[in-house]
Amino acid sequence: MNQIGFKNFRRFKELQPKDLGDITILVGANNAGKSTLVKGLLLILDNLRTLKIGGDSPIFQQPEFRFDANDYHDLGIGTFGRALFNKASKDMISFAVRLTRDLNLMDDSGNTFKRKADFSILIGVTGDKSTDQTTGTISRIWVSDNNRGIKFDFDY
């Protein structure tokens, strides 16, 4: 993962996408958002890994985004209401990530070649902050293949 950003998550109204390196060191005062950045990163990774969609096709079913503990981490967030920025104007959290990776590929003739994969992903999550709801509903998934200019937008 090369970048992360979010809106209305925990203490941040908006965190513009931040570059991440192979090693990233976070430094700041208490309550500056270091843990929030790490929790956001883990939350996105956990949900991308364990995304469960009812039915056969994500196009027709709204997937859920989990805020409670799962098989990988217990981040101490627990509910959509605890994850939502306390001064949010609407009950929606947005997560944005950019993934780049060098790939070694092989064509049909057995020739190998290198290609760089570069994808941007945006996930919009809505929920009810007044309940103990441990999941939010994914209302939008937007994926862009930055190399080819191909974009997919699932607006549930």
Where do the PLM segments sit?
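P-loop NTPase switch/coupling surface
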Residues: 1-156
